[in-house]
């Protein structure tokens, strides 16, 4: 599996059931920035023009390098494990979220994500107000500020 953002054909995982699009596969099949993902729902496999949702998996000790979501909102629900976000200018602020927590990330906010555990995977549901998933994400140099 590539963790670089290489895209897979996601249409094989979704069924159009007459206006309700169903996804029943959530296994890890692709990745981006050291995070593994299931197929998810997006504009790639549904008619969505403004939403996407995926199940994300961060390996033990894993880090999603600093980045910015350009012009879209993100809401995350942590199913398993704990993540630490270092965020803001220079990623100098920090907050931890654990299983059962939900949180919102503002568009344009620099952040880097860390799995707090060296032994357990993090599992989370990630929702975006962008149907294109990863195309509107930019790397952020946390040492530049």
Stretches with model-predicted labels:
Residues 46, 71, 90, 118-119:
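Short strand-connecting beta-turns/loops that link adjacent beta-strands
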Residues 59, 87, 97-117, 128-129:
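Conserved metal-binding segment of the jelly-roll/cupin
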Residues 63, 72-99:
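A short beta-strand-loop-beta hairpin characteristic of the jelly-roll/cupin
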Residues 67-69, 85, 111:
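Histidine-centered active-site/metal-ligand motif
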Residues 45-49, 58-62, 80-84:
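Short, charged/polar surface micro-motifs in flexible loops or helix N-caps
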């Amino acid at each position: 599996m590539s963790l670089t953002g290489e895209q897979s054909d996601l249409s094989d995982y979704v069924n159009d059931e007459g206006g309700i699009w169903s996804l029943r596969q959530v296994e890890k099949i692709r990745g981006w920035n050291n995070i593994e993902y299931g197929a998810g729902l997006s504009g790639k496999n549904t008619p969505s023009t403004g939403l996407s949702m995926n199940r994300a998996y961060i390996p033990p000790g894993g880090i999603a390098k600093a980045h910015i979501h350009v012009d879209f909102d993100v809401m995350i629900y942590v199913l398993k494990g704990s993540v630490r976000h270092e965020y803001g200018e220079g990623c100098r602020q920090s907050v931890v979220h654990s299983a059962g927590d939900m949180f919102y990330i503002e568009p344009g906010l620099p952040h880097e994500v860390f799995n707090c555990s060296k032994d357990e995977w993090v599992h989370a549901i990630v929702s975006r107000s962008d149907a294109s998933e990863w195309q509107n994400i930019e790397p952020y140099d946390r040492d530049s500020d």
